Structure formats: C-alpha cells, structure tokens
Amino acid sequence: MGEPGSGAPVVLDGVVEQVLEFVTAAGLGAAGEYAASPGGAEPDLYGSADAAAIRYILSDLPADGATRDQWVAHLRSFQDSDGAFRHTSHNAFHTTAQAVGALDLFDAQPSHRLSFLEPLLAAGGIESLLDELDWTQPWMGSWTGAGSASALLVTGMADRAWQQRYLGWLAQETDPVSGLLRRGSIGQDSGTFFANLAATFHYVFVGEYLAAPMTAPEAKIDSALRTYTDGMLSADRSVGFAQGDWAYVLNRATRHTSHRGDEARAALREVALGVADNVLTHGIQGSMHDVLGVVTTLAELQNAAPGLLLTPRPLRSLLDRRPFL
C-alpha cells in the first residue's frame, strides 16, 4: 500500500511527522512564538499564525491551558491601534484575516475592534472596494476582497444584511461562461486564466463558510477541468497553494451539481497522487507559510479523494473552520 501513481492508498504518516518536526524547529521557545521558517531568530506574525493553522489541521493545537493563553497573547501583540495586523509580506487585509483566523482557532478575538475596516460596513462600502480592485491582477486582489470579508465575519462585525450585499456582488459579477471573477476581465491564456480561478477560490470559500448557494458551479467545474487538462497543475517541481486553490474550487463545486462528476473525481485523484508523490520525494521545505499551503492542499485532496491519502488522523479542513487562507 502506498505507491503514488498506482491508484492504491498512499500512506503519509512520515509526511505528517516531518511537518510537526518542521513546526517545532521554527519555534523560539516561548509558547506561540515562531520564526517565519526554521533557523529564524525573530518572532514572526505569519510564523505564529501559520503554525497554529498547521497544528489545527493536524489535530495538534492546544485548546486550553497556559500554552493556549500565551499563544493568544502573542498573536494579539501584533495588532495596531486601528485594529489592523500588518506584515511586510502581505497587505493589511490578508495579514489581518490570517491573524484573526488564527485567533479564532483558539476561540479568541483580537484585542481591538477592526476600525480600519468599518468604512466597508457602510452602504456601498464593500461594493466600492470590490469594484476598485485591480482586476488585471485578480489573485493578489483577492487578498483584499476576501481578506476584508473574512476578518469582518470572524469578528462578528458583518451582519446578515452585509453578508447578502457581499454575496450579491459576487453573484452579479461572476462570469457565466467560466464561473470565475470578474465578469468582463477573464484572461484566456493559461497563466491569466489560472489567476482568475485562484482569485475566485478566495471568494468561493467565503460563500461556502456562509453556506450560500454557489453561482455557476457547472461553469466552475468546466474551468477547473480546463486548467487540469491544460497542464497548469504540474506537481513535478513544487506543490502548495496553487493545487489547493484548484482542488477546493473543483471539490466544492461538485457538492452543488453532478455536472461532469466522474471527470472531476478522476482529476482530483490524479492531482492528489501527484501532490503525494512530490511531498514523499522532496519532503517538507520552505517557509511556514509554504508548508501551510502544502498541508491545506493535502487536507482538501484527502477529502476530495476518499480513502486515497492516509494520515494518522484525518486532516481537518482549515477553511471549514474559518474563511481565509
């Protein structure tokens, strides 16, 4: 059992052990304090937030006690007075969503209200933000469009009326042919088309978190299968967020429609085997954020291909707990 490419179940117990060793190696001694990667000497917000997310996925996160309390305090220490969390690697929307999402794993909230996001709650606020994103760079723009929504939802600042406004904008602006965002700005070459799919992923997980009907699930499946058949998901060199974004869109769309179900399941299984082969061959490497991308991808593929990827305990879906990655 466990030869990638054979279609037989693949045992990933050793990969889970490597991930836990990686996280431990990035620890700086105090509870919750992690560097961005093993060997780093400075506490890093993403190191701490991503370590919490990884350990949640692996069912290894302390739920109570002094370790939990110190971790929460450390995460809160990164917040600015306007409510934002900031980091040089990502914009404040992404970083805030990541930090608030990490706190939520401990059933905790940030110390300060997210006042920098309050203008988005006013009439037309979130719609203006989404309208004014640079839709020629949709993947990066989705950090803002989905990160703001995630942070507002997880902190309880966004009421039902706001949620409906947000979902309504997404439904209206979804391209009916591709199922992707944004209508009128879908790139057709392989790179730009995949960027639209990866951007759409960020908005799909907000909709899934809110248990909303999915707009154009059949078209989303067609687009995901197009990227698969066009070879955009090669796991020969690296695996991580790209394969995970794709897997989430395709897997979750199959829950809303039976359209091309057999093809979708076959593609998900093949990509799952490719990702498993990569991590078994190359091991766990990169930054804590890179490893989060690998682990979340494995979790979604384990769910999408039942019985194929075996771990000591089933991997938890981070996005079923909080709407941001």
Feature map (PLM): residue ranges:
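Terminal, non-catalytic domain-edge segments
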Residues: M1-S77, N91, T96-G156, A161, ...
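A cross-kingdom feature marking solvent-exposed beta-strand/loop segments within repeated
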Residues: A36-G39, D82-R86, S178-L181, S185, ...
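Active-site cradle of extracellular carbohydrate-active enzymes
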Residues: D159-A212
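Short, aromatic/basic-rich helix-turn unit that serves as a nucleic-acid recognition element
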Residues: A235
